[in-house]
């Protein structure tokens, strides 16, 4: 049985940084050694991690891998490789594919695809519609990460817009409800207003006014109200405004029934970046003001925001052409998500410990994933080794997503992902992917 020693790393885990070493054996963390402590038995492989930080692998609860049916943009293989290169060891895939994951049959087909193609650990959401809530009772709570609810229209047109249906969804499942919250009526009013002035060529810079602060707040407010009425387990995804933060609490995560996610893009960019990046940063909900970004960053620290994810959503560059009404919404972010957040830590926005909490610990806790998300003895060895002070620049050559572009092209990072271990297997090693490896299906202890 192979034993691998990762030696002399700064281990970041559960709010602490310690110099130490980790032994991997049979997929799991066998020993955690502090300082000069020695392994209890010989190791077959020794990795000198001097100068590196060892983190639990990120768990990205919010990805769109476009498989099945939209594989001209992305597929499970390419995007899971991008995940591994970014230090992400587990993903949860969204249902707005073709066919949509809104039936039990489509759900089983998605699990089969993920098992055949994903290099990292995986689960997927069941998509809610106006009419399919009767199927919720048949969902396996140990396999399905949650129910995805689009309360605002986005890529895939899975909008649930009937109040009776919303009440049935919130009252009809014990699973986590992951909600995309934007009020469709307000979006339509805003769109009609600007179409009178610009026709179908509404400028891209007006995207945050079409999908406005009020559209986000009203929909999130309704979701919170319904969750409180039904005691549903609600997780609102990609919060984008300061105003929405008033809907959430910063009590300890274990006490929450209503949680909130911020995405890397909303923590990095502001509406001013449309001038240089254009449709590359067009997403739903829209990138908004610098004040909103600052409030979201502060909410990560205060506990109003519980997790950081990516909403990784690739499109071809040709599909990103046009203004606010024509360019498709979404961007690939998973490969550079962890290093982007570590860069914000260098700038004093977060601590490294907080990045680990929001990208690894909290997703494992919220989704009730046992034996992952922490560096603990007996846990699965989902680990990432990152090196600071290792300057490199994002180019198309290094992008593993099938779409082959990123809004971060030409950006220079000081942090670099060197190695990613999934279930103890060295999946990513300094630019090289083991294309033969497949991740494991996530299990939820509910």
Model-derived segments and spans:
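Histidine-rich, glycine-flanked metal-binding segment
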Residues: 1-4, 10-56
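C-terminal cap of metal-dependent C-N hydrolases
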Residues: 9, 323, 377-442
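A glycine-rich helix N-cap at a beta->alpha junction
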Residues: 112-128
